[in-house]
From Swiss-Prot:
The lineage of its organism: Archaea, Methanobacteriati, Methanobacteriota, Stenosarchaea group, Halobacteria. Pathway: Amino-acid biosynthesis; L-histidine biosynthesis; L-histidine from 5-phospho-alpha-D-ribose 1-diphosphate: step 4/9. This is 1-(5-phosphoribosyl)-5-[(5-phosphoribosylamino)methylideneamino] imidazole-4-carboxamide isomerase. It comes from the Archaea. It is found in: Cytoplasm. It catalyses: 1-(5-phospho-beta-D-ribosyl)-5-[(5-phospho-beta-D-ribosylamino)methylideneamino]imidazole-4-carboxamide = 5-[(5-phospho-1-deoxy-D-ribulos-1-ylimino)methylamino]-1-(5-phospho-beta-D-ribosyl)imidazole-4-carboxamide. It comes from Halobacterium salinarum (strain ATCC 700922 / JCM 11081 / NRC-1) (Halobacterium halobium). One of its GO terms (molecular function) is oxidoreductase activity, acting on the CH-CH group of donors. Its main location: cytoplasm. CDD domains: HisA. The keyword Amino-acid biosynthesis applies.
Amino acid sequence: MTFESFTVLPAVDMQDGQVVQLVQGERGTERTYGDPVDAATDWVAAGAEALHLVDLDGAFEGARANATAVEDILDATDVSVQVGGGIRSAEDATALLDRGVDRVILGTAAIETPDIVGEIAAAYSDGVLVSLDAKDGEVVVEGWTEGTGMDPVAAAQRYADLGAAGILFTDVDVEGKQEGVRTDPVRDLVDSVDIPVIASGGVATVDDVRALEAAGAAGAVVGTALYEGNFTLADAQAAVED
């Protein structure tokens, strides 16, 4: 998938073998929503064209504890899949891409070793998304627990130059709070790079989805709002097709 049109990606965030949603990325705030494979197949049955999978144990601990669930989702679905969480080396990324993942999401690894982006992109031109998670205007890593001192716009430009196929921007300040999105940070990123920007964090209504599309985002990752039934996936897709 090249995000030629705005795409709504249901989030399948995994922790201890279960689908969860966190508030502002903080452990201990999770709501649990069952089996990851069941969730993924349900979203595909509901019309999802792409899925966003995150191994939260990998993001927090560095070890991909939910790797088997990712494999099972790949076997059970036939849509575009992007995967993040615990991908700390080119070898980790390559193994996932060879297995059939469409895009790997690099966060901490890209910050610590920027050249890894170009290394992977050289072999998989559309295979690397760089995750820029921002809290109080600063890029954060290690499961959103450590600041980097990096400005999101400057970071996005750097990774675009290194060959990233897109930027996954998470606004941690509104993530999981169900209080709406902030479009200014998204628009700033969209205006600064020529690669797709996928937005995550804060979506509570279909109007939020529309707002992200209007801000120029190529897609939106939606989690809590879908799991809590604020609106359906079909509602969100229809909102950006009008």
